[in-house]
């Protein structure tokens, strides 16, 4: 199995920053400059840590079993890696896949291309991928490919 984790809304709480990228006056530079402030979402990070412990003992794929697929821009790669390391979510070199700096397509389109590339590079079929995702459009896209999707409730949702 490959385990695919989204970051924002699954591992990192960024609701306090969303005003920067919603509406007409989107300020992605400001958003990306502040994502290091994100607080960890305990439930998502605990699931990741548990899978990480199992994956280390039973690693089946040469590039590792855990991938991070995010709509974040490559501009934020170092900040994202530091955040993942700080919160115990990865080792030194995470399998981190991000959108290119100038790519402004919707997240589900970006992630579709990324997941296709991961499948081609690893030879792992979509049916052997477990995805943790909070965005409904992205979750639907993953499901349409045949991935097993754990649709994470948005961090602001109430029970």
Q: Where would I find each of the regions flagged by the language model?
A:
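Alpha-helical substrate-recognition element adjacent to the catalytic core
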Residues: 2-105
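Amphipathic coiled-coil/heptad-repeat helices and related helical stalk/stem segments
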Residues: 44, 111-114, 135
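Glycine-rich phosphate-binding loop signature in dinucleotide/nucleotide-binding domains
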Residues: 61, 118-127
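Short alpha-helical
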Residues: 74-75, 110, 137
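Acidic, Mg2+-coordinating phosphoryl-transfer loop and its flanking beta/alpha structural elements
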Residues: 126-159
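Short, aromatic/basic amphipathic alpha-helical patches
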Residues: 80-89, 117-118, 140-146
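The start of beta-strands in P-loop NTPase/AAA+ ATPase cores
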Residues: 1-3, 128-129
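Short loop-to-alpha-helix "cap/lid" segments that border enzyme active sites
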Residues: 106-121
């Amino acid at each position: 199995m490959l385990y695919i984790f989204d970051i924002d809304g699954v591992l990192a709480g960024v609701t306090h920053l969303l005003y920067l990228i919603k509406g007409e006056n989107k300020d992605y530079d400001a958003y990306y400059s502040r994502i290091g402030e994100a607080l960890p979402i305990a439930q998502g990070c605990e699931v990741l840590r548990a899978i990480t412990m199992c994956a280390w003992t039973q690693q089946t794929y040469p590039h590792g079993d855990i991938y991070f697929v995010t709509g974040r821009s490559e501009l934020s790669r170092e900040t994202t890696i530091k955040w993942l390391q700080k919160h115990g979510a990865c080792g030194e070199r995470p399998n981190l896949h991000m959108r290119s700096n100038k790519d402004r397509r919707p997240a589900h389109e970006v992630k579709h291309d990324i997941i296709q590339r991961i499948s081609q590079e690893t030879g792992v079929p979509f049916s052997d991928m477990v995805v943790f995702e909070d965005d409904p459009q992205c979750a639907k896209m993953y499901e349409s490919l045949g991935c097993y999707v754990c649709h994470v409730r948005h961090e602001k949702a109430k029970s």
